[in-house]
Design a protein with these regions (language model features):
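Elongated, amphipathic alpha-helical interaction scaffolds
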Residues: 1-274
């Protein structure tokens, strides 16, 4: 929704591809609006410089995105062949735009700045023979603080990440989601963050978030994320402690620490692991 004009979309394309296209008319938006894709509200596909780009937004991590990409690209290429009167049953090879699939992720679970998701990872047969079909989705984390170089070159995307972070912070402090949204939108408008967009589409943005927001699921996800981070941090501390004990040849302490939690805490404090 935020990238609802060619100028913003071209800026995003330039930021991702390190290009400097200036004419928005060079970009041909061809998002499918067929009934089959009505649920894919956050997708946009467009052609520029011989590349067929598919951009999709996801608020949860989904390893099945490459499979979605296959379905989507097959329809896009089918439309491209028809629109350009390409003869696929002749001996002459047809020329097609190169596909590029980008997934913008801003879920609450911690993910790296960039990750490649491959269709082949879904296949049951994992022998060394290369599959005849592959689709790669590049997932970019657009949560606030991630992909800072990308954000530096695309103000719209940076402001969107700030807005989402602002909404999340107010949800934690305000008594209702409605109050949180009102404050987040007012704050961003006052700080010139997506101000033009939020002024024009305030009601739509509010309604969209209220429609998709599940308070219980959101809080459960935050708790699960915190527990997972705690487990990872705890394992790192224990691994560090074990290394120190092994290096010092304190084998009896190592054995005792695996059975006695209080003694384990004492050793962690002794080695300054906190």
């Amino acid at each position: 929704m935020v990238f609802n004009n060619k100028e913003d979309l071209l800026q995003l394309y330039n930021a991702i591809n390190h290009t400097d296209y200036q004419n928005p008319d060079d970009l041909e938006v061809n998002t499918l609006e067929d009934v089959l894709y009505l649920s894919m509200k956050n997708d946009v596909s467009f052609l520029v410089s011989g590349t067929m780009n598919l951009y999709e937004h996801q608020s949860t991590f989904n390893p099945n995105m490459p499979l979605r990409g296959v379905f989507y690209f097959s329809r896009l290429y089918e439309g491209y062949v028809a629109d350009n009167n390409l003869m696929i049953y002749h001996e002459k090879r047809v020329r097609l735009p190169k596909p590029k699939y980008i997934v913008f992720y801003n879920g609450t679970k911690n993910q790296p700045d960039s990750m490649e998701l491959k269709l082949s990872d879904c296949f049951e047969n994992t022998d060394n023979e290369a599959p005849c079909l592959e689709c790669t989705a590049t997932m970019l984390n657009i949560n606030y603080g991630h992909n800072q170089e990308l954000m530096k070159h695309c103000r719209r995307l940076k402001e969107y990440s700030i807005f989402v972070q602002c909404v999340r912070e107010y949800i934690q402090s305000e008594p209702s989601v409605e109050d949180a949204l009102e404050k987040a939108i007012d704050t961003c408008i006052n700080q010139d963050v997506l101000a033009d967009f939020l002024k024009k589409h305030r009601a739509e943005v509010t309604n969209m978030i209220l429609t998709t927001y599940d308070k219980d699921l959101y809080e459960k996800t935050l708790k699960e994320d915190a527990r997972e981070e705690g487990r990872k941090e705890g394992m790192e501390y224990l691994n560090q402690l074990n290394k120190y004990l092994l290096k010092a040849k304190r084998y009896s302490d190592l054995e005792r620490a695996t059975e006695d939690i209080e003694y384990q805490k004492k050793l962690l404090k002794e080695f300054g692991i906190e």
